[in-house]
Amino acid sequence: LIEIPQIGFDAQSLTGTVQTGLGMYARGIARALEKKRELISLELLWPKDRKPFSATGERILWEMFNLPSKAKAAKSDLIHLPCFGVPRLTSIPRVVTAHDLIILKHPDMMPPGSRWYFSYWIPQSYRSADHIIAVSDCTKNDLVEYLNIKPEKITVVHHGIDQSFFNVPAVENIASVKDRYGIFERFFMMVGSFERRKNVELAIDAFSILAKDHEEVQLVLVGSSSEYRERMIEKANDYGLEDRIIFTGYLQDRDVATLYSICTAFLFPSSHEGFGLPLLEAMAAGAPVIASDIRVLKEIGGDAPCYVQEGKIEALMGSMERMLVDENIREECRVRGRSRAELFSWDDAADKTIEVYMNVLGMRGFDGIPARVT
C-alpha cells in the first residue's frame, strides 16, 4: 500500500485581498503543488478567519503554537513555510522558503516596529528548519555568508510565472485600462511595493529630466498605498508632473499584464531584491526591461534586460531615452525577454520543491517508485 506524504502548507501569506511578492509566490507554488496529487497531498493550514495578521505578536503566536497544532491535527508529515517563520515546538519536519536577507544587510530599510522579528526571529527560524528553499542563488549565498548556514542545507528553486502573463490582452481591455487611469500611448512603468530599495524616487528623478524633452511620455507607478508612496506623490507634484506621473494603486494581475504588454519599457532599478518577480512578469508579457545591474536581476533576467548602473540617475535616464526613440532596441528586448521568461514555470518549481520534501522525509524519487510503503 502506497501512502502519499501529507504536506501542511502555511497559508498565512495567502490571506488578504492585496498580494505582495511573497503572497504571489505562495499562491503560485501552492496551486502548482495541488496539481501533483499523485505525489503529495497538500493541505492549506489557515489562520483563524483567514485574515492577515495585524501585529507581529499575532504572527509569532501563529508560528509558535497555532500552526504546529493545526499541522498535528491534519496529520502532516511535513510543514512547508512559504514565507518566513518556522515553528520550533514541533517534531514535524519543516521546510522554509527564504526570499531575501535584506533586513540583515540593511536593517534601516525595515520599519522599527518589525526589525526585531526580521533581524532575530527570522534568522533563528532559518537555522532551526530542516531544509531551506532559496528563491535565487543570491539568496542562498547570503544565507551562507550572513547566517553561516551550510550550503547543503539549501536548495535553490526559482519562482515560476503565471501563464496568463504570456497571453496577448484583448483590444477592449487595453482601451479600458488606459481610459481608467488616463494613460497615454507611450509610458514607462514600475510595479511593486513602495519601499526605498525599489528606487522609485530615482525613477521619478530620471523621468523628470526626460520629461522636459519628451512631452508625450508618462511614468506609471503600480503599487499599494503606503507612507513612502505619499511622499513620492508629493515629489511628483513638486516637479509639476502630477498629470504625467500616474499612481494607479494596487491592480489585479490582468490589468498589470495589459500595461506590461503595451508599455514603452518596464523599469526595475532596485538596489536590493531576493528574486524580482515583476521582472519575470514583465518579460513574459513582452515588455522591454530596464533593470539595475545587481547580481540577482542578472541571474533572473539573463541577457534580456538593458542593465544600468544601480543608483545612477543619468544612466537610468539615458537608457529610458534610448528605449523611447529606438524601436529596434525595444523589439530586441521584447524577444529576448519572452524567450527568457519561458525558462521559468511553477510546474518545474513544484517538482523541485517536492524533491526537497522527499529528501527531507528520507524518501527517494517519484517516477513509479512508492513514496512510502506500509
Task: Place the predicted regions along the sequence by residue.
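Carbohydrate transferase catalytic cores enriched for Leloir-type hexosyltransferases
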Residues: L1-T374
